[in-house]
Amino acid sequence: MANEEFTGHFARPAPVANDEGRRTTSTSIPAHAMAAREDGRDTSVAVTLSRPPNSGIPHGIPETSASGRRLVAAHPQDAAMPLGLSETRTDLPAILRKNNGDFRTAMQHWRELLHENPDKRDREASALPDLGARGIKRPREIEHPGDANRSVTRREIGLGREIDTVAASSLVNRDTWVAHSSNGQGGPQAGVYNVQPSADRAQETSQESSTLPDPTSVSALYSGPPSEWVGRDTGYETDRNSGDTISAPIRGLEELEDSADSRYFGHEAQSLSANVTTSISNAEASSHSEHTEILDDVSSARSGEQGRGGDGGAILGFSHDLSPHPQRLPQTTPDDFPELTNAAMAEIDAIFESLSQKSLARESAAPVLHEPVSGDAFQKEGTSDRADGMPSNGEPPVEQAGGHLPQALRSSGAELDDFSWLTDAALAEIDALIKSHSNRSSSVRNAAPDLRGAGLDNAVGKDSVIEHAEKISIDSPRPARLNGERSPKAQKSSQASLADFPDLTDAEWAHIEETERIAITAIEKGKQKISTKADTRSGFGNSSVPQVGNRSGAPMVPNTNQPIPSWYHKAENISNGLVEDTHITPAVVSSRRRNDAENASTRFGDPAPALRHYNLGRTLEATPVRDVISGTSRDRGLTAHAADQLAIDDSRKRTDRDRKTQPYIRGLDSRSREGYGR
């Protein structure tokens, strides 16, 4: 042991532990070390076995696929030998013929020895060229320096597999750990191998280089949350499972273009600017990767083709801060319509200008009617004051002389030049028609009694529309008071005269006056017999309800100057019948029928029906007004009424039993009635 030398195959005592106890086992392991850092610490240790590389697969490296590639730890106890290699080998070293725990312990002890003796790495590295002299095939190794804290060596071993070894003593970059954690893989650990079939990596190996470009800002199209992109390791690894990592040094140009297309045109496409920073040596800091430039060109070209309108102007663009620029609509130019002549274009422009002016004129001339005016809620004059000269009755503004008003021209947007094809005679005829139509509509509207205005005037008072009919005279079609004096409002709102209706004859005027007189008389009679004021009275659980009563008053005497036709008396009789039909007159019935009705109402919980006489002599049953109660008060009233009726019936029964009166004989037959009271 003391005379051992560092050769291509050297033996190092390694204390191992097994079931039999502690002992020392010699293992033959070829090794080499990478260049040391400036502070003297080693950055990586590449490990291979002493057996030929094509003879088998080391322990702890399971089979993986291209789609489900993952990082696995090189623990021999968790792996099984591939098919065809499970038979017993006699040429294996002694450490490989032992159990898996001995091999793991020996490897750990060997790494500790290398860490304690950094001065021997040069001697170990110098022994590497002797491998070719001894006839041993050296594994194909490609160094991929990562950041300042780690270095990765890719080695090709037997059966078409590659091993990416991370140094045991190297510090893992925090960004790389975050990126692996976001993918659910966990951070890279010491002694962890990334194994994938070399056939799947053949295309990527031809594209990759031994170094990465200088730290630069790469504009990459990426679909997904930004947290999955920031801190992702883009040095040499590509996660094919998720498809989210875009590594420019490894992926081909065709794959980059396809990725840019699929990610830009998707619904989740986002244009992000990710700063992909990689650490390289000072000698390679000045070099710039052409893949980065091509990636930027492809991204900008794809986004530019889809973000342009018909005229070549950009429609939508995204900056690196994810804030969209304002959208600019395309503008039409004369070049877009080569079939149109200059005259046609000028005509189109003139039409567009006229339409624009008309729309602006309508907006400026429209009256503001939606503004709330608290003081004019019941005033009809307030609307005309706010309508900019527009009359309150909605008449079109027409000049007295028959000409057009300037305000009407402004409100409609029409001018005389717009109707150059109309002659003076046609314009005069139009003015005459407008004037006659306005006069006719105003005459008909003013001739009718303004009952709607009466309702507005008395909206907050006690008088009703019926009482307002006092202002309408009998012998005049215009509203007036009973004494013949016209009210100011009636004079203002009604200005009809015989001259307004030249087509009506005297007979038609007389018929209209008689009809109006009949209507007013019926209204007055109904007002005398029907009171609008509510009277209250108490009953069995009944609340205050309006009662119907007669109000004394002298009937209105018709005008004696006008003859009263015979059909007027018929109409008066019909009106009196309708008014009298509203009064309920209880009928006089026997005590037996009244008791039966009360008992039925008590039994079924319904109000007791009352009897009344119709004006034609028929006796009908009707429900009194006092018993029509709604809601909870009705139920309480019925309950109280039933309790009172039960108490009254019990009192009557006791009185009849004591006095032995006649009502008890009703339920007895003739035989029992003979001996009753003896």
UniProtKB/Swiss-Prot annotation:
Residues 230-242, 378-388, 649-661, 668-678 have a biased composition (Basic and acidic residues). It comes from Rhizobium rhizogenes. Residues 204-220, 274-286, 537-550 have a biased composition (Polar residues). Keywords: Crown gall tumor, Plasmid. Residues 306-315 have a biased composition (Gly residues). This is Protein VirD3. The keyword Nucleotide-binding does not apply. Residues 1-43, 178-254, 274-338, 366-405, 438-457, 469-501, 530-558, 587-611, 631-678 are annotated as: Disordered.
